[in-house]
């Protein structure tokens, strides 16, 4: 998995590409989400348009980020979710 990130109008946009499964690649996404949360960013969008596959580890990362942001009065949204995901 590759990951690009940027900030537009105060909104963090993360764009993973490839498969989100366990291991170092999934850790990268998890770390990046939590890095932005710790830096007080309250709005995160994860664009899944280029994600080919996601297992339960990947789903757990998304749920963890969503929960942590919600607990800090923030929001995590998923964009461009394919039927496969």
Where in this protein do the model-derived segments appear?
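Short beta-strand/loop segment at the start of cytosolic alpha/beta domains
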Residues: 1-15
